[in-house]
């Protein structure tokens, strides 16, 4: 695998990805939400620039779609440094990592997405690079093999993960800065929707933006996706103007309810209610019943349902709460109303 294959070029994407790239903020001032993280990172960046030093290695974690990659890009822009992007699964061998590290310029930022998926050999190779900016590689084979230590330019590693608990302690402890991204509130999401609409030249009223924000499950990526789909609906039905009624109508067609739950979320809750008497039920059993992978439920479904108080995770499995029954219009397991019965 050549070095160029190991890096992700953000310009080499389809049109949808280019749209996503175009609406990303490029500075902390334009980065909406996550105020505690922003204020801390601004302080750390100013201190590093004042010392003319590298920024400490950063670990950013949180549920998918909250802006980990965007924040890494913003940090690179604020530091006025180069930005190289790769991902844990791509780095299969120590040589893959070495090919990237030896091409870095001084003070560059290397971003590794899904860093929890680094294999053991690559992770071990990374340790001296993080601590001492040195790289130990094995040259030759068999009895003729020997270790060579290479000097690396000073750099900053930014790792992103949705599963911080899967990182080994030695790797986690080598990050000087650890930031947790949290779900966004509705007001911040409304601002994100309005900002994206302005960049994409989408006509939207304030109440229309609020309706999309309320159904975006606290996640900017979902807010921007829903904005683009509601735009499609408005282009056909409402002369391209997104107002509240059009947003509601479009989101009902997309089967996104007022709490932001999509069909997979409702299937998850309904199966626990109807097949397993409200739980508890093991995740593997639940995944089989739904026909989805365990990781999909853990990463994409459960975090928001837990945050909204719809499910509980216990040692015996998953159980639903009274709030879930109330939201789906059920009392003691009997359906009294179906929002999407049409």
UniProtKB/Swiss-Prot annotation:
EC number of the protein: 3.6.4.-
GO biological-process terms attached to the record: DNA recombination; DNA repair
Location of the protein in the cell: Cytoplasm
Residues given in the record as DNA binding sites: 294, 313, 318
CDD domains attached to this UniProt entry: AAA
GO molecular function: ATP binding; ATP hydrolysis activity; four-way junction DNA binding; four-way junction helicase activity
Stretches the record annotates as Small ATPAse domain (RuvB-S): 185-255
Keywords of the record: ATP-binding, Cytoplasm, DNA damage, DNA recombination, DNA repair, DNA-binding, Hydrolase, Nucleotide-binding
Residues annotated for ATP binding in this entry: 23-24, 65, 68-70, 131-133, 174, 184, 221
Catalytic reactions on record: ATP + H2O = ADP + phosphate + H(+)
GO cellular component: cytoplasm; Holliday junction resolvase complex
Family stated for the protein in its record: Belongs to the RuvB family.
Record's comment describing the protein's domains: Has 3 domains, the large (RuvB-L) and small ATPase (RuvB-S) domains and the C-terminal head (RuvB-H) domain. The head domain binds DNA, while the ATPase domains jointly bind ATP, ADP or are empty depending on the state of the subunit in the translocation cycle. During a single DNA translocation step the structure of each domain remains the same, but their relative positions change.
Name of the protein this chain belongs to: Holliday junction branch migration complex subunit RuvB
